[in-house]
Amino acid sequence: MSNIKAVLFDSGRVLNGPVTGHWFITPKFWDYVDKTVFESIESSKIHFAFRKADEYINTQKLITTKEFELECFIKFYEIFSNSLPELKLTNDKINLIANDLVYNPDKYVFYDDALKVIPELSKRFKLGIVSDAWPSLLDVYEKNNFTQYFDSIIISSIIGTSKPDSTMYVTALNKLDVSSDEAVFIDDSLKNCLGAEEVGVQSYWLCRDEKQYMLNKIKSIGKKYRVINSLNDLKKYL
């Protein structure tokens, strides 16, 4: 693939993941939520609470500042709290959790392969991020000195749409000044990979789970997209 000039990456579950293991359980979540009470609640009820809050945040397509992001996540945790009255979350605690989600740049941790591969690839290609996320994601990259490796960072809430809308990929290509056949895209979602394929970008479906990787590798036979188990696998294709 000698004509490749740019590599586009999803962020979450590709380059980094939540330090707590859950996107909306923030690093200081247990400072404000009684863990014993939380763990005594049926998991189905907890899933429902997060799902209701998630339904709300997904309606907020355009979030261009961290200030508005905070407003939205205060509402998010209010909805979450209303579904779980057992937690007895006060308005102050709700505000503190939301603040932790928006203003704590240590909420995500970068994967080992990302820490190794990204600096290497940045020497050979233009790199871009195409992520369904909010403005605070930029702080995570800045805190980890990772913005230096990327020529473009496209965040869905800032442009008002999300993957697999073609606007996400086309905006990234335009920012990097490359054509679709000069770029590749890596995501942990097949749907998003297929969205990239629709605009002519070769995609790589990242499956970090070994069993899922093996299964999806077999299913990908004859398909345009490729399946990889690690970012290290990119080296044999680029």
Identify the role of each PLM range.
Residues 1-51:
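Active-site neighborhood of HAD-like aspartate-dependent phosphohydrolases
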Residues 1-7, 17, 119, 134-238:
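Asp-based, Mg2+/Mn2+-dependent phosphohydrolase catalytic module
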Residues 24, 28-32, 45, 52, ...:
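Alpha-helical elements of Rossmann-like donor-binding domains used by nucleotide-donor carbohydrate transfer enzymes
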Residues 42-51, 91-103, 201:
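Short, well-structured alpha-helical segments
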Residues 52-98:
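A metal-dependent, Asp-based hydrolase signature
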Residues 131:
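Conserved phosphate-coupling serine/threonine residues in phosphotransfer and NTP-handling enzymes
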